[in-house]
């Protein structure tokens, strides 16, 4: 299986992909370089597919990859409800794509980055 090294060691690369995938799940749209976006597209699609499966094993596999970050805080009936990125993946995002077989993300090209001319894109959930 081929992958992009992204100029980092394997542990740094894996940590960056976990962070970007978690950010994409939480925000549903992020701005990054084209190479990074093409890599996190793979991991995000796998996480959404696990979310669609919805069983305990899929939840544990996703929990091993997705960072434990707060996705949403809201109040209902004087109780504060905190939703993690994993809960958002399984309760909000996965049901949205129940009828869709793959292709959960979209990459839109934007202007190059001013400092070094890197190709910048917006990656978002469809």
UniProtKB/Swiss-Prot annotation:
PROSITE patterns: RIBOSOMAL_L17. Belongs to the bacterial ribosomal protein bL17 family. NCBIfam families: L17 (TIGR00059). Part of the 50S ribosomal subunit. Contacts protein L32. GO terms for cellular component: cytosolic large ribosomal subunit. The keyword Ribonucleoprotein applies. SUPFAM superfamilies: Prokaryotic ribosomal protein L17. GO terms for molecular function: structural constituent of ribosome. Keywords: Ribonucleoprotein, Ribosomal protein. The gene is rplQ. GO terms for biological process: translation. This is Large ribosomal subunit protein bL17. The keyword Ribosomal protein applies. It holds the Pfam family Ribosomal_L17. Disulfide bonds: none annotated. Signal peptide: none annotated.
């Amino acid at each position: 299986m081929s992958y992009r090294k992204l100029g980092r060691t394997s542990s740094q690369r894996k940590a960056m992909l976990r962070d970007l995938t978690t950010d994409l799940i939480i925000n549903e749209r992020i701005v990054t370089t084209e190479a990074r976006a093409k890599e996190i597209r793979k991991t995000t699609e796998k996480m959404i597919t696990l979310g669609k499966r919805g069983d305990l094993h899929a939840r544990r596999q996703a929990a091993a990859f997705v960072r434990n970050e707060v996705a949403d805080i809201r109040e209902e009936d004087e109780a504060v409800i905190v939703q993690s990125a994993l809960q958002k993946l399984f309760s909000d995002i996965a049901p949205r794509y129940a009828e869709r077989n793959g292709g959960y993300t979209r990459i839109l090209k934007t202007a190059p980055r001013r400092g070094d001319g890197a190709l910048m894109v917006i990656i978002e959930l469809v």
